[in-house]
Amino acid sequence: VTLKTSKMTMRINLKNGRISYADAAGKALLAEQREGTQFTPVSYGGTNSYEVRQAFKLDRDECIYGLGQHQQGRMNQRNQHLILRQNNTEIAIPYLQSVKGYGLLWDNTSPTTFTDNPVEMAFTSQMASGADYYFLCGNTADEVQRLLRDLTGQVQMNALWTYGFFQSKERYQSQEELLGVVKKYRELRVPLDGIVQDWQYWGTDNNKWNAVKFDN
């Protein structure tokens, strides 16, 4: 089966369910790996479900970006193994964007593993009822991002100062120390738009957190 729009073509193999994508000119963009959709029965807390794995075939020199914020110092996520689960200093976003002009949003809320190697790229989710993802095709990177915003919702821009210079450390011991750092920045005429208090500024009793006093 072949489905066409003004931007892309999608082909579905009815014998094995494999899906491939191409742009309007017929240039291949992405294809599911042969036998790349796998369902493994699992049970959590008495609930029966499936661990779902979906594999794709990428070009050898194709760069992909995204997947959140991870502490491995990489922007291009080729040949990486990532746990897509929220953690301290780790932000998981199961979305990637390719230099070939497409984005892929893996639609699953359970802990997920992303892997890429010379053979295939794959998402594996611990619990799912199906292999669910969105393929976004655009002429430019901005257009692909617009399609993602159409899916997730439009977000207002932050205040201008939030895009400025920030100072942070682990951690300031007192309000006096924090304000002293700001004062020093001003004395040196070094730009500073925000400073991060970080943890423990709320004291030992969270129920009585003081919003106007550094109470640790």
Each language-model region and where it sits:
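Catalytic and substrate-binding clefts that recognize carbohydrates or anionic sugar/phosphate headgroups
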Residues: T2-L160, K169-R171, Q175-E176, V182-E187
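Aromatic-lined carbohydrate-binding/catalytic grooves of carbohydrate-active enzymes
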Residues: Q156-N216
